[in-house]
Amino acid sequence: MNWAPATCWALLLAAAFLCDSGAAKGGRGGARGSARGGVRGGARGASRVRVRPAQRYGAPGSSLRVAAAGAAAGAAAGAAAGLAAGSGWRRAAGPGERGLEDEEDGVPGGNGTGPGIYSYRAWTSGAGPTRGPRLCLVLGGALGALGLLRP
């Protein structure tokens, strides 16, 4: 099991659970109906009774449900990627590795460009390795230290 994506998904679920607000207002913002004073709103200055509609989108736990659905979709995508990797699909070459596209330069009839001036990394500034997994591991370590993540 690849722990970096699992840690990221656990962090997403923990953040959705901890940041879920029961006082979140559902639906579209702003006054609607008689509170706006439109044609159907009755006379101006008349006492109005504000009827609060049932919460739909901002109900407690809805962001947790969305995060759980996202985690399930991510798990399904990860499982599909794992199955695809095991069934003959090739993995993309990482930084510093030579892939199949790099090897076609050396064969007779290759284009001869090589990984030098024509490479994407030569033309982009600061194209070093990404630091995403490090952040994920730090956050996963923090969750593990807090006892929220159990391997």
Swiss-Prot record:
Residues 89-113 are annotated as: Disordered. Residues 1-24 form the signal peptide. Keywords: Amyloid, Cell membrane, Glycoprotein, GPI-anchor, Lipoprotein, Membrane, Prion, Signal. N-glycosylated. The keyword ATP-binding does not apply. Pfam families: Shadoo (PF14999). A lipid is attached at G126 (GPI-anchor amidated glycine). InterPro entries: Shadoo. Mainly expressed in brain. In brain, it is expressed in hippocampus. GO terms for biological process: protein import into nucleus. GO terms for molecular function: nucleic acid binding. It is a lipid-anchor; GPI-anchor. It is found in: Cell membrane. Prion-like protein that has PrP(C)-like neuroprotective activity. May act as a modulator for the biological actions of normal and abnormal PrP. Belongs to the SPRN family. This is Shadow of prion protein. The gene is SPRN.
